Regions:
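N-terminal glycine-rich "phosphate-gripper" loop used for MgATP/nucleotide binding
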Residues: 71-73
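Structural motif
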Residues: 65-66, 111
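Conserved phosphate-binding/catalytic region of the ribokinase-like
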Residues: 124-210
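Short, flexible loop segments at the rims of nucleotide/cofactor-binding pockets, characterized by
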Residues: 43-50, 66-69, 88-93, 116-118
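Glycosyltransferases and closely related glycan-assembly transferases
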Residues: 61-63, 76-89
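Conserved N-terminal subdomain of the carbohydrate kinase-like
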Residues: 1-65
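Structural motif corresponding to alpha-helix initiation and N-cap regions
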Residues: 51-58, 76, 96-100, 120-124, ...
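Conserved phosphate/ATP/ADP-binding segment of small-molecule kinases
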Residues: 83-157
Length: 210
């Protein structure tokens, strides 16, 4: 936790609302398949188990145009408030495609990301259904098979950049960061997908991606 705190400050991020608690750091236990491919084994919530943002934290968060979170961020109950404040919520569902979660979360989301093992014939139907709950964009990533975005009118696909892979930790997070950056600067869908693929390609070449 302390290392991440220092890293945030190194990148000149505002840490005034970062809560520091005694206890274990929230982590995912992971394994590497074939020496390079990350596999999530278990979420250990640590201090995040009891995390609750203060009212000052919430008001501070609402000053931003974009908010990124996920199912473990413990702010799902705040999504309606964030949307009402005009914030665009970027939501990482990871591998979770539970319909109950989608119905509860997606009405308040601007762009949703889903991690899929393979690009199956059913994926387009899934993205159409996910978008029917309300988000502007829904994106699926397929590892080495690239990515796909649906905006309600068309499906756009993007391949990966072929680079030497050290490990895939951070590949998904960096793809989301690149795609979101594209949204922020006004890229079209193709441009956003390319931004995601380019940043992800940089990250998978590093052993210490963060």
């Amino acid at each position: 936790g302390g290392e991440m705190f220092d890293l945030c400050r190194e990148y000149q991020m505002d840490t005034s609302h970062l809560q520091v608690k005694e206890g274990k750091t929230s982590v995912y236990r992971m394994a590497l398949k074939d020496g390079v491919d990350r596999v999530h084994l278990e979420n250990i919530p640590g201090v995040m188990e009891y995390y609750e943002p203060t009212r000052k934290d919430i008001e501070f968060t609402k000053t931003f145009d974009y908010i990124h979170t996920d199912l473990t961020g413990r702010v799902l109950h705040l999504l309606p408030e964030f949307k009402e404040a005009g914030c665009k919520v970027i939501f990482d569902f990871s591998i979770n495609k539970d319909e109950e979660n989608m119905a509860a979360v997606l009405p308040y989301v601007h762009c949703a990301f889903f991690s899929c093992e393979k690009k199956t014939p059913e994926i387009r139907e899934f993205l159409i259904k996910a978008r029917s709950y309300g988000p502007e964009y829904v994106v699926a990533t397929f590892g080495e098979e690239g990515s796909m975005c649906y905006d309600g009118e068309r499906f756009c696909e993007q391949g990966i950049r072929v680079v030497p892979v050290v490990n895939t930790v951070g590949a998904g997070d960096s793809f989301i960061a690149g795609f979101t950056w594209g949204l922020m600067v006004g890229r079209d869908i193709e441009g956003c997908l390319k931004e995601g693929a380019d940043l992800s390609a940089q990250i998978v070449q590093r052993f210490n991606p963060y």
